[in-house]
Amino acid sequence: MAKMTILKMKARLEKELDAPNRQFAYNRDNDTLSVTQNGKKVTLTIPQIVANYENDGDAAVEKIVYYVEEGFRAAAGNVELKNNQANIYPVVRATSFPSKTKAGEVLLTDEHTAETKIFYAFDLGKSYRFIEEGMLEKAQLTHKEIREAAFRNLANLAIPLKKDAVNGNDFYFVRTNDGYDASRLLNEAFLREMREKITGEMVLAVPHQDVLIIGDIQDNTGYDVLAHMTMDFFADGLVPITSLPFVYNNGKLEPIFIMAKNRLKE
């Protein structure tokens, strides 16, 4: 099989994503491909897609195409908040994530940690659309009502855990791919339940949207494994959040920086 290059991947993505009213713009300086449709834009980092392709083959490209198509579909979808509060969920994003749409609409958010911010989304089935502040007046709902509905719905989501162990350190993974895996970090009842179960230090990570990692850390090896694991997930995620894990103590999440086999407290 011929080696996949950045230009070959660019051409393939343009071919597979080609559609009426859709434009492409390639930035040679940082090797990104912007896809625009009806004023909505998605920017793809081609070297990352090539790296994923080398590991996963065509499945990596299919995943990107699906992500873009569903994103445009969500942007075009109608949002009726008033009678559909069961479709509202909180989602976690990096603090650097844009707080406005391309059209300048302010997104509904809440503060979370120094590394993360809470946004609110309206579930559309296979995708979701971020809730804008302007939608609340039309729906005659308050920020508080949206928040309460979102966290109530989050509490009803199942949390299946997969467990792995490395040298006495246990790691639990939430990977349902329902779009809200990282959001489980906001389920305080679940965090308290895990804290009671864990015998070491409880360290969590949300490197990207589709994974939550919980570590029962007993020693420096555990911190080292978690640090490498988090960086790997962060690099592979379609929607990266943060490469910094969080220590959970007394009901609070505190970001920490882990280097090599040492844990450095913030």
Curated annotation (Swiss-Prot):
Name of the molecule in the record: UPF0354 protein LMHCC_0955
Domain of life per record: Bacteria
Family: Belongs to the UPF0354 family.
